[in-house]
Amino acid sequence: MKQQSGLTMQQVVLATGNPGKVRELADLLAAFGLDIVAQTALGVESAEETGLTFIENAILKARHASAVTGLPAIADDSGLAVDVLGGAPGIYSARYAGEEATDRQNLDKLLAALNAVPDGERQAHFHCVLVYLRHAADPTPLVFHGSWTGEIAHSAAGVGGFGYDPIFFVPELGKTAAEMSKSEKLAVSHRGKALNLLLDAMKHG
């Protein structure tokens, strides 16, 4: 526990080593008395993602982090589903081109897979599942899902974001996710929607 402006802060472990995700959540949840700490800062290694869905993997990650630290945990599992590919890369989005693949390698593999697919048939959906576990054996974890629909562009554009953002084109805005500002993206993205649901639950819980 730590104090912030007279408020006792409850430590919550975030089941990720991604500093961007930690900062994003830390700023948003501080107002609810939650002190977000990355699992890497507590010496927690990543859980093996053996689930078949985003929800299963998010729960696995949260339960692992909570069991090791004894703290409440939040986990995020996200990915991109392309309609014409039957929902691929899906839960394998981060390792689409291999276990150690870079964002660029994953992106290039997807562009190659869609090389002959015309406009109008390149619809895709980003999904984000956020899970909140009060403790490792929590029988009723809080689960929040956000989705974002767009199209896969024929080439990358923009330098912001990460992952598939440079080729995820949003027709309503006329730009890719990587061409948006952080605040603009958070207002419409899959992660932003899931975060808003989590924040709403915290307000009423």
From Swiss-Prot:
Cofactor(s) in the UniProt record: Mg(2+)
Residues annotated as catalytic: 77
Taxonomy, superkingdom: Bacteria
Pfam family, one: Ham1p_like
Keywords: Hydrolase, Magnesium, Metal-binding, Nucleotide metabolism, Nucleotide-binding
Enzyme Commission identifier(s): 3.6.1.66
Catalyzed reactions per annotation: XTP + H2O = XMP + diphosphate + H(+); dITP + H2O = dIMP + diphosphate + H(+); ITP + H2O = IMP + diphosphate + H(+)
Gene Ontology MF term list: dITP diphosphatase activity; ITP diphosphatase activity; metal ion binding; nucleotide binding; ribonucleoside triphosphate phosphatase activity; XTP diphosphatase activity
Gene Ontology CC annotations of this record: cytosol
Annotated InterPro entries: dITP/XTP_pyrophosphatase, ITPase-like_fam, RdgB/HAM1
Annotated S-S bridges: none
Record-linked SUPFAM superfamilies: ITPase-like
Cofactor mode of binding and number, as noted: Binds 1 Mg(2+) ion per subunit.
Binding sites annotated in the UniProt record for substrate: 16-21, 78, 162-165, 185, 190-191
GO biological process: nucleotide metabolic process; purine nucleoside triphosphate catabolic process
Binding site for Mg(2+): 48, 77
Oligomer and partners: Homodimer.
Family annotation (NCBIfam families): RdgB/HAM1 family non-canonical purine NTP pyrophosphatase
Task of the protein: Pyrophosphatase that catalyzes the hydrolysis of nucleoside triphosphates to their monophosphate derivatives, with a high preference for the non-canonical purine nucleotides XTP (xanthosine triphosphate), dITP (deoxyinosine triphosphate) and ITP. Seems to function as a house-cleaning enzyme that removes non-canonical purine nucleotides from the nucleotide pool, thus preventing their incorporation into DNA/RNA and avoiding chromosomal lesions.
Family according to the record: Belongs to the HAM1 NTPase family.
Protein's recorded name: dITP/XTP pyrophosphatase
Originating organism: Erwinia tasmaniensis (strain DSM 17950 / CFBP 7177 / CIP 109463 / NCPPB 4357 / Et1/99)
Lineage per the UniProt record: Bacteria, Pseudomonadati, Pseudomonadota, Gammaproteobacteria, Enterobacterales
